[in-house]
Amino acid sequence: LFDSEIMWYKVTPHLGRGVKYQSYDKEIEIPSILYRELKNWERTFMLKESKLRRSMDNYYHLSGNNPKIDNVRVLIDNNYVFSLFKGIEQSKINLSTGEDTTIDFEKETIHIHEPFTPGEFATIIERHTTEIERYILKILDTAQYNAADIDSVFITGGSSLVIPVREILYRIFGKDKIRTGNTFNSVAYGLSLSY
């Protein structure tokens, strides 16, 4: 979910989102529908033979052969979307240190080196972190518990490293109650125990 937001706000402008093309006497922005599809890497393999992909050839010519439009064509035609998302994921991991990072991706004619700050990330995912906080408070209310009644909270998975997520948990439960361990493997281990 967070990776999809990073893709939309930080990466798709390198792939032509926002580029305009000439239509008679008007400049029109390329429709964003293809870029919305890119937010879901697991479905992007279907784009290669799609009408959306073919439309990018037209937009490429109408935009004066804009190289950003060519980037999205290269990305889709060579099934590079998953690799791009790995770069996005790495930038998210880097941000968990609280330091600035870059989203780096190099394939053929695509050269993306997009600066990315923790503050930008917090803004991009704010609507999701607001929902996370709302759900936590709702669960506590439904269970008729106060945060003070909880002895410890065990967090795991990649999102548990995201600073805005941790800040919510610290604010609700207190930093001293938050426990973690084997962040990337404990979810899979727990699932394996259920079989």
Give short role names for the model-derived ranges:
Residues 87, 91-94, 124-150, 194:
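Phosphate/ATP-binding catalytic cores across multiple sugar-kinase/actin-like superfamilies
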Residues 19-27, 140-157:
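Short glycine-rich phosphate-binding loop at a beta-alpha junction
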Residues 6, 88, 136, 155, ...:
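Residue-level signature of catalytic and energy-coupling elements of molecular machines
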Residues 1-105:
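Phosphate-binding glycine-rich/basic clefts of nucleotide- and phosphate-handling proteins
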Residues 73-81, 110-139:
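Adenine-nucleotide phosphate-binding core of ATP-dependent small-molecule kinases
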Residues 148, 166-192:
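Conserved phosphate-binding/catalytic loops in two-lobed NTP-binding clefts
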Residues 76, 80-81, 148-169:
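Glycine-rich phosphate-binding loops at beta-strand->alpha-helix junctions
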